[in-house]
Amino acid sequence: MKKSEMKGYRTHHCNELNLALVGHKAKLCGWVHSKRDHGGLLFIDLRDREGITQVVFHPEKDPPLFAKAKQLKNEFVVKVEGKVVERPAGTKNASIPTGEIELEAESLEILNPSQPLPFNLDEDIENEELRLSFRFLDLRRKKILNCLKVRHLVSSVVREYLSREGFLEVETPILSKSTPEGARDFLVPSRLSPGKFYALPQAPQQYKQLLMVAGIDKYFQIARCFRDEDLRSDRQPEFTQIDLEASFVEVEDIMKWVEEMIQLIFLKVLGIELSLPFVRLTYSEALDNYGSDKPDLRIEWQIQDVGTVFKNTQFKLFRDVIEKGGVIKALNAKGRAPMVNSSALEELVGIATSMGAKGLAHIRVENQEWKSPIVKFFSSEERKELERLLRMEPSDLVLFSAGPREQACLILGKIRLHLAEMTQGIPGNQWKFAWITDFPLFEYSPLEQKWNSVHHPFTRPHPEDLTKLNEGKYDAIRALAYDIVLNGVELGGGSLRIYEKELQEKVFSILGIGKERQELLFGHLLKAFQYGAPPHGGIALGLDRFVMLLTGSESLREVIAFPKNRHGVDLLTQSPSEVDYQQLKELNIQLSFPSIKIEP
């Protein structure tokens, strides 16, 4: 390498040196990953973001340099210059790209020392609170770093694909308007407008619809979103979604773009070519066959309706359910009977009873014999038809749920998933996508005694069901909405939108939002609909959740650089935190919590 090329901190990253560069000079910068003293020779593994290079120090060639190298400790930041040499026979390491060479050190500069680390970067650390408190160190771990690289690659592919398809990336406001009909907003007080507040956006929903009214035609954004809600393992108060919207589209147009984008992501990130199109299931089909609106299609078992088998049954439990208009559903867990002992079965019964069932009837097939307290109530014709319908064989475990359709399906859906997890019935390295369509537009809340949107109030009713709006048959109206599901996890959801002022006002009124409140909260959108709003629709995919699945991570916190913990706290910066009294005074805010003391 020419001398002029040796200026600056480094000439290469720690994954780039190889046999082709033997004899060349190189400069590397990074962190001391490990240090080893082997019979006089001193070795360090030097690590940067891209990889590791072994550096060797010879005591006889440069004693002062060797003495300086002996001072090194793990995670010291150093700059090393030297000559690339081939490793001696028997010392090569095929597990890393630089494993055939080493850098023979000629100079060493310690750029910054390091305190001893609170945990070993090479180990899995169970104490997540400790990791998050030292997140800047946790991010040095290869596993977490890889998650961020995958996240970057996914974002890059999204931008590449959507730009190629004619979408414009447009940023929408972070300081927005509060519309408290959904989840709780994060509020931001305005200093210049005392007593008034911005809200951090839960989604760019209204802005992207306004962009369609503006004639943008195709919009996308990798959008930051905020929701002040109770946290679960798969939730964060701030999250990122791949957001897109387009004008003059049908449902299939949106699905095609999303499928092709995901196909490209899988090819570039995992080297896997997905088959298109993805499976399509209506909401009713998903509920009836899988007991869930986000079915895991890796599990082969399907729920089946066996009501016809027992239409004339003498088994009182089933007969009473049928007479009340209920259903009899069955799940045949193929080959699982030997894997489910009495305690495991009690666990399944507990799931059913927790969801409102009185119990969980079952049949074990042992050889050619059915083991169950209920089979004595079945006629020979019922047994024969049940065996045919469920394809019952030795070692099968059949579970029954009887009651109202939705309840019976949901119970077996949860048991289906739990039983598959319990008996290792979910194949690894499979990617099963599905679109779920034709959701109900509304759902009734007995607690609130009002109708709510299943998705959001801007979702377009199915054209075949529009007359039911005026007839008051709200529970029979389908939505032009669609969710995309991967391996039982909802990746995202979207819909075609309402773009007529009168129809939007009608939906608002069904949801209990009066005219005055409509104008207060959504007047800007209703006004826009009077100026030539085009038909439009879109979707939002959870970027964090998608990357979590792609990397096999257990939590969203693994794929976010600086996440909050389960209590919504950033343990690194200790936020949220108290603020200065003067800041509150400027915002005309007075706290009313006696447990919080802020000194002037």
From Swiss-Prot:
Keyword ATP-binding: yes
Chemical reaction(s) catalysed: tRNA(Asx) + L-aspartate + ATP = L-aspartyl-tRNA(Asx) + AMP + diphosphate
Positions contributing to ATP binding: 227-229, 236, 490, 542-545
Main localization category: cytoplasm
Residues annotated as site: Important for tRNA non-discrimination: 38, 90
Xref: Gene3D superfamilies: Bira Bifunctional Protein, Domain 2, GAD-like domain, Nucleic acid-binding proteins
Binding-site list for L-aspartate: 181, 227, 455, 497
GO BP field: aspartyl-tRNA aminoacylation
Subcellular location: Cytoplasm
EC numbers: 6.1.1.23
Segments of this protein annotated with the region Aspartate: 205-208
Keywords attached to this entry: Aminoacyl-tRNA synthetase, ATP-binding, Cytoplasm, Ligase, Nucleotide-binding, Protein biosynthesis
GO cellular component: cytoplasm
Record GO terms (molecular function): aspartate-tRNA ligase activity; aspartate-tRNA(Asn) ligase activity; ATP binding; nucleic acid binding
Domain of life: Bacteria
Record note on quaternary structure: Homodimer.
HAMAP family associated with the record: Asp_tRNA_synth_type1
PANTHER family named among the record's database cross-references: ASPARTATE--TRNA LIGASE, MITOCHONDRIAL, ASPARTYL/LYSYL-TRNA SYNTHETASE
Function according to Swiss-Prot or TrEMBL: Aspartyl-tRNA synthetase with relaxed tRNA specificity since it is able to aspartylate not only its cognate tRNA(Asp) but also tRNA(Asn). Reaction proceeds in two steps: L-aspartate is first activated by ATP to form Asp-AMP and then transferred to the acceptor end of tRNA(Asp/Asn).
Family the UniProt entry places it in: Belongs to the class-II aminoacyl-tRNA synthetase family. Type 1 subfamily.
Protein name: Aspartate--tRNA(Asp/Asn) ligase
Source species of the chain: Methylacidiphilum infernorum (isolate V4) (Methylokorus infernorum (strain V4))
Classification lineage: Bacteria, Pseudomonadati, Verrucomicrobiota, Methylacidiphilae, Methylacidiphilales
Gene designation: aspS
